């Protein structure tokens, strides 16, 4: 038989950001615990609100599965004599296991027949195991921030006030400090705070609802969306929906109710990002827009109670947003009294990082690098690139960005436009922060793209240069995201930049800030980019072996890397693909310690040598011509023509002969052959079926 398991941890309000992971952890922890305990179970569900973490497991077996443990002893041939009597080896084994010799059996293994014992262990009752299991689960939960509360000897996000623990309707007894498990839950803190008993999940869901608690996050999310849409429609608008904000407010409330408020139309004259940031980031309000996406003077907020007088709640929220927007309007007006040009000097008071100097110093560095990049892409861009880089961080000195840090770049763009800057420069000021997330929007202007690359490269090389590199678990300066940003911008714009040159120039500009040798820093930065590029390409679905093969042949030119990978993937269908890969592996093993040598055709003694050499000379000329045009598919087809001569060579010619000059000549031929393959990829890394 099986029963239902129900656990609820009642707490003070846990931060919304902590809850999704905590519920996910509870699910994985109970699955692991039951599996390791050999207790069969069915579906696992989790529920959560700011004041409770809940876990329900269906069809939990009443006892562990029985277990048979087999213990091998000595080989049978040394365990019994010719008459079948047990030897000292067998008797000693039986004694060590606490069994009679008559209980000894035999088992056939790969190494022969051995004596053994088999113990049948009956499973314990589930009830006898759950107390410790659930207690351990609760005390093992981890949060981004936690502390010890009162006399508790373990850390938790917030103080625990009650524990509901039931199996088959009966309490699972355990105690965590002064909190004893029971069969009662509690209602909404303000609307129905009384404790109430429950006996199963169905009753739990019904009674929590009666007490103004909707424990299922997905249901709260649905209610919020539906009611917010209705409220926005009532003022002829629609909700500006945002999944992150929706997730946050879902975990901020136990019983969501909707309030629609308004603000003075004069605030609509502020940049829309200012209004949206004020509402969404700071107040957790949903903005309301018209059908064209223009902001309306309304907002939707999610309340956690049924208000006796909704108008009072509405006025309270309107008062809060009015103060926020009034401050924003003041900042907006005051900031415009000082031009962005004049704010650049103020960046000397803004620390970028104690080891890398001020934001002013950073601007001077990446401004120089941006000019270097512009010279290589299109010198006609240089003046606008220089201006964009100069003003890129100027808004860090404004009151608006000081209050709303999320608006950096956005306010720089707005203030630049208001001051009459070239619109391309204004846009580049904003775009140099892009992409904001992995897979996010990329800069559209060349000016924005170039300054973005320069800024990110300065950060990456700078932090590597002072030995603040990402670890497996931490990347506090978002260097992985910035490296992906550089890669994606270069690929998107198809810029003819090589990583080697870019890193070299960046490190030379940073030289006085470096705390490590420049060459060591350079090597680590390039390897860091290789890792980011490899992960990105594999995550995009490119075969692991093809990615590895192409990157091993060089990855400095990112645009060419993509072309090579695409050509290699198409070439996979060619009959010569796998045979060439196999031959390359074979040659690679032979050539491990060999360095380039000169080929002397006069030393060829086999027809297969001459055939391979002549075919190589013809193919190499055509391959080089194709590579000059970046025509990798054509180059690979030319290489495919070498398949038969290569096969014949390996079938008929012994490379590692005793005669040194002949051996050296044949190695030189192989090296010349496969060096041209390596212009595209290291075929030895290709996974073959043979």
UniProtKB/Swiss-Prot annotation:
Please give the biological process terms from Gene Ontology that the record holds.
Answer: arginyl-tRNA aminoacylation; glycyl-tRNA aminoacylation
Does this UniProt record's set of keywords contain Cytoplasm?
A: yes
Whether Nucleotide-binding counts among this entry's keywords is yes
GO molecular function list: arginine-tRNA ligase activity; ATP binding; glycine-tRNA ligase activity
Q: According to the UniProt record, what class of enzyme is this?
A: ligase
- The UniProt transmembrane annotation reads none
EC number(s) in its UniProt entry?
6.1.1.14
Query: Per UniProt, what is one Pfam family of this protein?
Result: tRNA_synt_2f
**Enzymatic reactions:** tRNA(Gly) + glycine + ATP = glycyl-tRNA(Gly) + AMP + diphosphate
Q: Which keywords label this protein? A: Aminoacyl-tRNA synthetase, ATP-binding, Cytoplasm, Ligase, Nucleotide-binding, Protein biosynthesis
Q: Name one GO cellular component term.
A: cytosol
Compartments, record wording = Cytoplasm
Lineage, top-rank taxon, reads: Bacteria
Q: Provide the disulphide bond pattern.
A: none
**Per its UniProt record, what PANTHER family does this chain match?**
GLYCINE--TRNA LIGASE, CHLOROPLASTIC_MITOCHONDRIAL 2, GLYCYL-TRNA SYNTHETASE
Q: Which family does it belong to?
A: Belongs to the class-II aminoacyl-tRNA synthetase family.
- Partners and quaternary state? Tetramer of two alpha and two beta subunits.
In Swiss-Prot or TrEMBL terms, this protein is called Glycine--tRNA ligase beta subunit
Q: Which organism is it from?
A: Syntrophus aciditrophicus (strain SB)
């Amino acid at each position: 038989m099986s029963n239902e398991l129900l656990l609820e941890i009642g707490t003070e309000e846990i931060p919304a950001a902590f809850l999704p992971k905590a519920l996910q952890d509870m699910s994985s922890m109970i699955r692991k615990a039951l599996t390791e305990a050999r207790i069969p179970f069915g579906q696992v569900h989790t529920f959560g609100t700011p004041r409770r973490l809940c876990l329900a497991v269906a069809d939990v077996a009443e006892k562990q599965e029985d277990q048979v443990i087999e213990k091998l002893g000595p080989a049978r041939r040394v365990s019994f004599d010719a008459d079948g009597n047990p030897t000292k080896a067998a008797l000693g084994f039986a004694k060590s296991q606490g069994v009679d010799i008559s209980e000894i059996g035999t088992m056939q293994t790969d190494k022969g027949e051995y004596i053994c014992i088999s113990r049948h262990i009956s499973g314990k009752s589930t009830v006898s195991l759950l107390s410790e299991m659930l207690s351990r689960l609760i005390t093992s939960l981890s949060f981004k921030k936690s502390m010890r509360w009162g006399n508790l000897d373990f850390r938790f996000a917030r103080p625990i006030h009650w524990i509901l623990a039931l199996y088959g309707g009966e309490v699972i007894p355990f105690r965590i400090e002064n909190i004893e498990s029971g069969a009662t839950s509690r209602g909404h803190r303000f609307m129905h705070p009384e404790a109430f008993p429950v006996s199963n999940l169905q009753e739990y869901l019904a009674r929590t609802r009666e007490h103004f608690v909707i424990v299922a996050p997905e249901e709260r999310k649905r209610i919020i969306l539906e009611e917010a849409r209705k409220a926005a429609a009532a003022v002829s608008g629609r909700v500006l929906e945002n999944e992150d904000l929706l997730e946050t407010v879902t975990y901020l409330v136990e019983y969501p109710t909707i309030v629609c408020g308004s603000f003075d139309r004069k605030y609509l004259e502020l940049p829309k990002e200012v209004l949206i940031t004020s509402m969404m980031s700071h107040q957790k309000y949903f903005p309301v827009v018209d059908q064209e996406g223009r902001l309306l003077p309304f907002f939707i907020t999610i309340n956690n109670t049924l208000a006796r007088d909704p108008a009072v709640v509405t006025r309270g929220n309107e008062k809060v947003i009015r103060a926020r927007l009034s401050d924003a309007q003041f900042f907006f007006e005051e900031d415009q009294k000082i031009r962005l040009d004049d704010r650049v000097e103020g960046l000397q008071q803004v620390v970028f990082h104690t080891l890398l100097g001020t934001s002013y110093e950073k601007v001077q560095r990446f401004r120089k690098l941006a000019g270097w990049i512009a010279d290589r892409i299109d010198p006609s861009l240089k003046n606008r690139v220089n201006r964009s880089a100069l003003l890129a961080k100027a808004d860090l000195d404004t009151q608006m960005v000081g209050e709303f840090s999320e608006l950096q770049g956005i306010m720089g763009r707005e203030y630049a436009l208001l001051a009459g800057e070239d619109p391309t420069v204004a846009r580049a000021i904003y775009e140099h922060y892009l992409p904001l997330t992995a897979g996010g929007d990329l800069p559209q202007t060349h000016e924005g793209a170039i300054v973005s690359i320069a800024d990110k490269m300065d950060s990456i090389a700078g932090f590597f240069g002072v030995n603040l590199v990402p670890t497996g678990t931490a990347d506090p300066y978002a260097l992985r995201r910035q490296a992906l940003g550089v890669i994606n911008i270069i690929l998107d714009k198809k810029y003819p930049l090589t990583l080697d040159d870019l890193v070299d120039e960046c490190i030379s500009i940073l030289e006085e800030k470096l705390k490590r040798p420049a060459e060591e820093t350079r090597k680590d930065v390039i390897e860091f980019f290789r890792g980011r590029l490899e992960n990105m390409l594999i995550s995009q679905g490119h075969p692991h072996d093809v990615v590895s093969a192409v990157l091993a042949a060089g990855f400095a030119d990112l645009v060419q890397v993509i072309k090579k990978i695409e050509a290699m993937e198409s070439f996979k269908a060619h009959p010569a693909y796998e045979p060439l890969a196999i031959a390359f592996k074979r040659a690679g093993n032979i050539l491990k310690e060999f360095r380039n040598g000169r080929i002397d055709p006069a030393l060829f003694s086999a027809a297969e040598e001459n055939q391979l050499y002549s075919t190589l000379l013809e193919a190499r000329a055509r391959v080089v011509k194709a590579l000059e045009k970046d025509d990798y598919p054509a180059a690979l087809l030319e290489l495919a023509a070498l398949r038969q001569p290569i096969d014949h060579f390996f079938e008929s010619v012994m490379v590692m002969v005793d005669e040194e000059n002949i051996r050296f000549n044949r190695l030189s031929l192989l090296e010349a052959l496969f060096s041209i393959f390596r212009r595209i990829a290291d075929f030895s890394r290709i996974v073959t079926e043979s």
